[in-house]
């Protein structure tokens, strides 16, 4: 009864107006699952390949009809007849069918759509919420949201090199409270920026995209917004950034155009360290470039005991690359993006490896998103503890937050909010003194 009987795919649009793929998998029982695949702007060079058509006369080359055809053709032929409850078998079938290291033949977007839609169909067949199907009876941890409230870099047309400035409501008692604290701070920040004559248009992920004098000014605005919202910077709301340093790394140097500075990896580490001393900055993603493994080692040695150092571009959700990072003492956390690796099984393997090595995990969206909220269920199902899914506006971001509210309601008293735990993991007490906070 849980046998796959049909697979369908279509081309839809993501939050940037670019095509992406949506897949539906139907079972013999009549149950079905649907999944839409996101797309990134700043991408790691070793990510699994997102298959695009390349026809400049259609969607400027970004169409995904080839991926759709692959799903409707040889992928459907290979998976029809498989049991949707056997996710590992299904994903291995996809991997064998593609036969390449980076999924370039069938496309990671095509494969992931089938993989996730199958999981949804299976959970529907069993009558289980998706988070419980993915994680079992112990799925109970509501993640701390890393809320992107100022955008820069590849996500916004402004002069900030750092791609994301985020807030983490670590002092909240529940996810519901965390969401409220973040929303209040977001609206306060908007008012502060507008009062000073800054534009309050938003970037790809819903954060504001002002032209500021410096990155330091961005931190000042955010800490002021936290305070004027009635919260304590650090104790109740901490800060996080995604530097996306690969985007401004050239010829072995870090070129910060907005700052008018060029840094070596040691100088870049020192610059980031200054912010952690000055502000309650407890999480840095992609502080150095993906190819700068030597620099990452130094960054981890100098800041890794007290700051969460999240590897995104350097690890690309790949268990083999993560294993190398663990062996070499690089980073202490990994960003998890489903479309970087291309199947649910490989994603779960990467999360398990990270947990075994005491690396924290952050489940993440992409800058080109859809209304699909699979990652919200994944974050709770795997007790990941953290989720990064944009700002407090744009329905493609809020879809994930609203799903987490529903999950928290469903869990009732069994749900645990991860805020205090992520702080204690890095020895952060919340009462530290900072120069400007």
Swiss-Prot record:
In the UniProt record, does the keyword Secreted occur? yes
Where, in this chain's numbering, is Mg(2+) bound? 242, 285, 312
For this UniProt entry, the molecular function terms from Gene Ontology, in alphabetical order, are: magnesium ion binding; phosphopyruvate hydratase activity
In this chain, (2R)-2-phosphoglycerate is annotated as bound at 163, 337, 366-367, 388
Catalytic residue positions = 205 (proton donor), 337 (proton acceptor)
Provide GO CC annotations from the record. cell surface; extracellular region; phosphopyruvate hydratase complex
The protein's name:
Enolase
Species source reads Nitratidesulfovibrio vulgaris (strain ATCC 29579 / DSM 644 / CCUG 34227 / NCIMB 8303 / VKM B-1760 / Hildenborough) (Desulfovibrio vulgaris)
């Amino acid at each position: 009864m849980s046998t796959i009987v049909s697979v369908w795919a279509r081309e839809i649009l993501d939050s940037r107006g670019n095509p992406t793929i949506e897949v539906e998998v139907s079972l013999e029982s009549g149950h079905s699952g649907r999944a839409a695949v996101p797309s990134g702007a700043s991408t790691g060079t070793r990510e699994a390949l997102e298959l695009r058509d390349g026809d400049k006369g259609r969607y400027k080359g970004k169409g995904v009809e080839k991926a759709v055809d692959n799903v409707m053709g040889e992928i459907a032929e290979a998976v029809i007849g498989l049991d949707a409850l056997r996710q590992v078998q299904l994903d291995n079938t996809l991997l064998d069918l593609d036969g390449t290291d980076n999924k370039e033949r069938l496309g990671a977007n095509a494969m992931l759509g089938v993989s996730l839609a199958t999981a949804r169909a299976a959970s529907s067949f069993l009558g289980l919420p998706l988070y419980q199907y993915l994680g079992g009876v112990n799925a109970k941890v509501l993640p701390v949201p890393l809320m992107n409230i100022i955008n820069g870099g590849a996500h916004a047309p402004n002069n900030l090199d750092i791609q994301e400035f985020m807030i983490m409501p670590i002092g909240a008692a529940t996810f519901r409270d965390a969401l409220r604290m973040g929303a209040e701070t977001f609206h306060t920040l908007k008012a502060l920026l507008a009062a000073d004559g800054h534009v309050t248009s938003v970037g790809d992920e819903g954060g504001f995209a002002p032209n500021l004098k410096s990155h330091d000014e961005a931190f000042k605005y955010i800490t002021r917004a936290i305070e004027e919202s009635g919260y304590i910077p650090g104790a109740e709301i901490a800060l996080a950034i995604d530097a996306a340093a690969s985007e401004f790394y050239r010829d072995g140097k870090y070129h910060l155009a907005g700052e008018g500075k060029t840094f070596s990896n040691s100088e870049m580490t020192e610059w980031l360290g200054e912010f952690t001393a000055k502000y309650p900055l407890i999480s840095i993603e992609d502080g150095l470039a993906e190819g700068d493994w030597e620099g990452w080692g130094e960054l981890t040695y100098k800041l890794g005991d007290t700051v969460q150092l999240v590897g995104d571009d350097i690890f690309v959700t790949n268990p083999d690359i993560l294993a190398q990072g663990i062996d070499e003492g690089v980073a202490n956390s990994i960003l998890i993006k489903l479309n970087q690796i291309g199947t649910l099984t490989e994603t779960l393997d990467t999360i398990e490896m990270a947990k075994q090595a005491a690396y924290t995990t952050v489940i993440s969206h992409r800058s080109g998103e859809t209304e699909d909220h699979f990652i919200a269920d994944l974050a709770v199902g795997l007790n990941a503890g953290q989720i990064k899914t944009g700002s407090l506006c744009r329905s493609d971001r809020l879809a994930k937050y609203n799903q987490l509210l529903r999950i928290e309601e469903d869990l009732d008293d069994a749900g645990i909010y991860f805020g205090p735990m992520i702080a204690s993991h890095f020895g952060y007490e919340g009462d530290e003194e900072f120069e400007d906070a």
